[in-house]
């Protein structure tokens, strides 16, 4: 992708997703950034450490997010919903066999 070198697209059950080349999806990087307590460059460094990425790769994800915020926010929402459904199913199963 010419505007965002280092970003590629993966196909999967949830559709086409922006991702770092040889790395996590952009939405995963953004989600980690939202969850760290730090802000600014320290937040980027913290996310890089958590994800075992170079700071420059986290910055690539941030740059992509700044241009496609709505798309990435929708992917985060979909992932959160899928996680909640899976946890609910697990709890129901545990109650059934408890």
Predicted feature locations:
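Short, Lys/Arg-enriched anionic-surface-contact patches
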Residues: 7-28
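Short, amphipathic alpha-helical "recognition" segments used to contact nucleic acids or chromatin
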Residues: 23-40
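Short alpha-helical "recognition helix" segments of helix-turn-helix
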Residues: 46-49
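Major-groove recognition helix of helix-turn-helix-like DNA-binding domains
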Residues: 55-67
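Short Lys/Arg-enriched helix C-cap and helix-to-coil transition segments
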Residues: 71-86
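Short, functional C-terminal segments
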Residues: 88-98
């Amino acid at each position: 992708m010419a505007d965002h070198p280092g970003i590629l697209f993966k196909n999967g059950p949830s559709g086409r997703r922006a991702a770092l080349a040889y790395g996590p999806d952009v939405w995963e990087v953004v989600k980690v950034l939202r969850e760290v307590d730090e802000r600014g460059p320290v937040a980027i460094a913290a996310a890089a450490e958590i994800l075992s990425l170079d700071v420059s790769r986290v910055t690539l994800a941030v740059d992509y997010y700044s241009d496609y915020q709505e798309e990435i926010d929708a992917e985060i929402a979909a992932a959160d919903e899928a996680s909640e459904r899976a946890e609910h199913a697990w709890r129901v199963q545990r109650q059934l066999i408890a």
